[in-house]
Amino acid sequence: MKKIGMKILSIILVMSLLIGGSSATTTASAADLGKTLENTGLGIVALIFSTLVGGLNFIVPDSKDFIKVEDRVVENFYEGTETWNDEAKADAKWSLGHAKASLVPSDWETKDYYLGGFIDPNNGMVNKVEEIIDDMQIRVIALSDGSDRGVALFANIDCIGFSNGDIKEIRKRVEAMDLGVEFNSINVSSTHTHSCIDTQGLWTNLFPKLFTNLLKSYIPFLEKERGADAEYMEFVYETAAETMKKAVEDMRSGTLTYAVKEVNDEYFNNKNRSQSTSIIDELARFVFTPDDTNYKPTMIVNIAAHPDVAGLPVDEIDNGRDLTGDYIYYLGEKIEEKGFNFMFFNGAIAGIYEGRGPAGDGVPTERRYEETLRYGYEIANMALNLTNTVEQIEANMTDAEKAKIAEEKEIGGENYTLWYEGWEPVTEKVLEPNLNILIKEVKIKVTNPLIKLVGKLNLVNYTVCKEGLDYYIFAEIGYMEIGGVKVAFMPGEIVQDLICGGGSLTADGSYSGKAFECKTIYELFGEDAICFGLMNDALGYVVPDNDYTMALLGDHYQEMISLGRYAGSTIMNGFAEIAEEIK
């Protein structure tokens, strides 16, 4: 497929050379000419794709569930804390509760379930669950600063993505429980694991459902099937709400600390968007320690890396039909082994994948999930030891851990890399009990014809709104300061340049040859801000407007799974408004 795509691109580039050759100047450098030809070719591909899919859109009627923008009613939405406190109250105290549950259905061996992440020729275009390797989990924390401004709930689900419509279903069930506390926010994020049961709908019996819903589009009285399995989603809603209830009931007072460290950037692989030049190689952790020592502390980990290794179909054994939580499961397993509860938030992960080289160590593995185990364990060891010296790290090791290192050094030889070699500890700071959250909606214009078609065919649980001939989706963005630590809530897979700046925001580095005009998260809130990605929605990829093209080839495949060319600026302008509000 890739070879065919490259041949097509080559033909298009030759055509664009013939068409545009007369406009080239003799003074243009070879690099400039190459860039011009490449962009011209990409533009032609984008035009062809948009025209073909746009034509299909034209003949497929809108879903009867689409509504006018002015008729939209906002429900099950939380704006955050009522006030923005600059400092902690005199008598304030952190309280945190934790709970987790499995989302593996009991009937998985007798009913067809589909993994969200890959439908690929290498798995025969079949992604039904055949084996459970470890687990698919939901993890929840309930957090309060004791200021009577409500409790914040955070859930993290092992899945490819969780749409805002489904998140509101969870909120509705939590609200119905009447747990005796006020919530300032109920937040749900996805790990973006590519080897757990599909919760979005794009991977569940896709092709039969696609054609069935296409036919039903022309018969008004027939209901389209939803993308994700309806019974399974009901199970997820109920399990999520019940787990949130348990987290609230588990709340107890304690202290909260924070540490962050830049780790080797080889642990993070920018695989398919080379013009986005930033790599966020920070590992951040929060640790909640209860006052009552009879209860476990809770560790919250934040890094930015796609969990897509275990689910990629490559052969008959690793065939993309095995359920696993990828590296995040093993990250949690190791941290729990050391006596902590575990919570996770992924970061800005567009184009950023697990860099398995340093964790691989030249040690042979038989299955791809074993590679994620090694990666997860290594990240966990770093998280557990951010504030420890090399001497402390070695003193805290068990005999079994020391023996394992010695054994693997022998196997890996010169390819073995000790994760803590040259390790420098960082300082952990105690966080004042002051929690501020501000969440707002942004109205994103949908320009991607493929996403319009997905909406018309009812495959994903979005509320699509119309204004004239244009389509819109409302998404949630948010900003939190937790004891002074700044956190941006991003509703999808965000290009890291939008967080900290980078090549794709510049005129020279972008497809359009123009600079991105909005400020980055670092510019708005400071370079110490971190990102919780896929939070309160899963909008697909969010790329800078100036580097957006529907060419699908090369470094622009992310645009195929994005709302459109204005998602980046709409979201960043929303954050600019938040920055103004909290001044």
Give, region by region, the residue ranges found by the protein language model:
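Bacterial N-terminal signal peptides that target proteins for export
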Residues: M1-I12
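Hydrophobic core
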Residues: L13, L17-L18
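Sec-dependent signal peptide cleavage junction
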Residues: I19-D32
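Conserved beta-alpha junction segments in alpha/beta enzyme cores
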Residues: A31-S189, T193-R374, T387, E394-K583
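Glycan-recognition surfaces in beta-rich domains, encompassing non-catalytic CBMs
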Residues: A383
